[in-house]
Amino acid sequence: MTLGRRAPGFASSGSGRRGYLPRDLRPPVTIFEEHEGEIERALGKLSKHVPFAEAFAEGAVGEAIRVDTRSTAVTPAPRLSGVVFRVWTGRLWAEAGSSSFAAKELDATVERLQAEASRAGGTAAPPGESMTTQGTWVTHPKRSPRDLGTEGVIALAKDARGWASAVPGIVEVQARVQWEEEQRLYCNSAGARCRQTTMRSHAVVIPIALENGRAEFDYWNSGGVGGLEAVADFDEESVREAALGSKALLQATAPPAGETTVVLDASVAGLFAHESFGHGTEADQFVRDRSYLKPLVGQTVGPEFLSIVDDGTFPGGWGTIFCDDEGHPAQKTALVDHGRFIGALHDRETASVLHARPTASTRRSNFQCRPFVRMTNTYVAPGKHTVEELIAEVNDGVLLERGTSGIEDPLGGQMQLKVKRGHLIQHGKVTELVRSMALSGKVLDFLRSIRGVSRDPLTSIQPGFCGKGHSDYIPVGTGGVHLLARAIVGPA
């Protein structure tokens, strides 16, 4: 799976038109208030015929604004909404969904699922514990993009374009500002009823520099749960720094190749935590014997000063949730605790099979997709050293910055991380700027090579999207601090 540092979820397109008409952007909570009774009635009807039944309903609204030097595009988030019912037949799980909340359609969906459950048969109790959590959670943005309106958000994006364009040598700027408000409703026959309304806001600015026919770009990227206040440092200084970074990359040299000492910045350490290590801790991989980490639970995999966490409660984190899609309240789960791999991420079924406890890690991409064990916000916890102390330890190496993507291998334990830029480190000093590169190798070898973790405070989470296979994309966050280690690097 690739963790994309791309804009969240909405494909931008358009023709630069002006005079935008008002859109129907009712919050999904309004949609569900009209139909929750019908969903619960249908669930009650279904529950009379199976050992366990649950319903998951989902809907979202939002907008993506994209501006460049030639056009302005406004793209509404896909108005996808619907409900899926899932039952334990006594032998297996079965589910059926509907994109309509009309009573007739819900009844037809339930009857179809009821017939399937009857054919499947079985007398066993459902695996794991059925949750009884009840609650309503709502994101209350301090600076809602709704209040600005479409024209106000366009003005923000144009401001960012202007800040970057003012830097000499910048020939193109892509600026995107987008938000989405999503409601999820989970209820089951054991009594759980969880409704969560979550707003996520995100912005990215990509200035492109051109010299002698060669183009380069750096970027600025920020987002989180909340309104525009969750887009930290969305200001002229940050955008101008990205534009200057694009220009500087035109003069950057090729990165080193081969095994060397590396320092990972916070964005790259976060990519490592999620992509290279985190996917191997998703316990559905354990059940299928497809994770190299399965036999290592309880063992030391890294130095005593290394801890890796998945945290669905991180304040304002891009992957933060209130509860998962089986009704488990969000939690903070330690994966590596002081160098020891202490456990995996679980849904109710994997927890039952592996004699563990669920970790609020069951997430659906939407009502049309299956539930899977997924991450939320995954990061390397702060350590003991300053960044300067880590750099001073390096005689000849490279600092990797601006993580862009990664590829994981949960079965074989191999990894590859790509970064946009870096700097050489020579005799304990950061020196020459180098172009994009990739870090690769075996995850366990990299973990054992870690010699230092910086203590800089973890104040923000980088936004990204992660798929399970080639689809099922969900918002996930990554973060961390600086790591000092050994790895193989080369041009990307």
Which role fits each region the language model picked out?
Residues L3-A11, R17-A492:
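N-terminal small-residue-enriched
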